[in-house]
C-alpha cells in the first residue's frame, strides 16, 4: 500500500530516491512559479497595497512559524507522513487553481498565501522520511543530488516564467493552472514514497 514502509531497507532507499527525484523535479517548478509569479502579479497586475505585498513576501515565514504546532497536530493523526505530504500538496494545488480566477489583490493574495503556508510544511515532514529511509552514510549524497536537480529545474522555469509574464502579464492564469497540475504530480509522487507515521 502506498505511504507505508513494507520493503527491505535497500528497496526502501532505492524507491525513496527514485520517487523523490520526480517529486523534486515537479516541486522545483512549483517553487519557481511561486517565486517568479506571486509578487510580480500582485504589483503589476493587481497594483496591490503594501500590506498585501508584505503578506505575500512573508508567506513562507508565516508557514514556518506554525510548523511546530502543525507537527504536533499531525503527529496524532497516525497517517504515514507521505500521505500527509500528499494531502498538503493537493490542498495547495486547489488554492493555486482558485487564484487563477482572482479579480482582486486580496483574493489573489489569500489563495497564494494559503498555498504557500501549506507547501512549506512539507520539507520538515520529508526530514522524517529521509531519516527513516536512508542510511546515515548515504543520506547526504542522495538528498543533495535530488535537491540540486530541483534547483536547476527551478531556475530554468523561473527564467521562462519571467519571459512569459513580460510578454503578457495575464499569462499568470495559465501559469497558475500549470502549477496546479504540477502540484498534483508532486502529491502523486509523495504517495509512492515509503513512510511511517510521525510519533507525537
For the regions a protein language model found, what residue spans apply to each?
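Helix-loop boundary and gating motifs at the non-cytosolic
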Residues: 2-67, 71
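Helix-loop junctions at membrane interfaces in 12-TM secondary transporters
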Residues: 15-17, 98-112, 168
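Hydrophobic core of transmembrane alpha-helices in multi-pass small-molecule transporters
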Residues: 25, 95, 105-123
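Transmembrane alpha-helix termini and helix-breaking/packing motifs in multi-pass membrane transporters
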Residues: 39-45, 72-77, 100, 151-176
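Glycine-rich segments within core transmembrane alpha-helices of 12-TM secondary carriers
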Residues: 61-68, 143-161
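C-terminal ends and interior cores of transmembrane alpha-helices
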Residues: 87-104, 163-166
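Intracellular juxtamembrane helix-capping segments at the cytosolic ends
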Residues: 120-134
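C-terminal membrane-cytosol helix-exit motif in multi-pass small-molecule transporters
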Residues: 180-199
Amino acid at each position: 500500500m502506498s505511504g507505508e514502509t513494507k520493503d527491505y531497507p535497500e528497496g526502501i532507499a532505492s524507491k525513496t530516491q527514485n520517487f523523490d527525484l520526480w517529486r523534486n523535479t515537479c516541486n522545483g517548478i512549483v517553487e519557481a512559479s511561486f517565486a517568479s509569479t506571486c509578487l510580480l502579479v500582485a504589483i503589476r497586475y493587481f497594483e496591490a497595497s503594501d500590506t498585501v505585498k508584505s503578506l505575500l513576501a512573508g508567506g513562507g515565514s508565516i508557514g514556518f512559524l506554525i510548523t511546530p504546532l502543525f507537527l504536533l497536530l499531525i503527529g496524532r493523526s497516525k497517517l504515514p507522513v507521505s500521505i500527509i505530504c500528499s494531502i498538503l500538496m493537493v490542498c495547495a494545488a486547489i488554492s493555486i487553481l482558485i487564484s487563477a480566477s482572482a479579480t482582486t489583490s486580496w483574493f489573489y493574495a489569500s489563495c497564494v498565501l494559503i498555498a504557500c503556508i501549506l507547501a512549506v510544511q512539507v520539507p520538515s515532514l520529508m526530514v522524517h522520511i529521509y531519516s527513516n529511509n536512508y542510511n546515515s552514510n548515504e543520506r547526504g549524497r542522495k538528498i543533495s543530488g535530488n535537491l540540486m536537480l530541483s534547483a536547476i529545474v527551478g531556475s530554468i522555469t523561473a527564467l521562462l516564467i519571467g519571459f512569459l509574464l513580460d510578454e503578457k502579464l495575464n499569462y499568470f492564469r495559465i501559469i497558475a493552472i500549470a502549477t496546479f497540475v504540477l502540484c498534483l504530480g508532486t502529491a502523486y509522487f509523495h504517495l509512492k514514497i515509503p513512510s511511517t507515521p510521525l510519533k507525537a
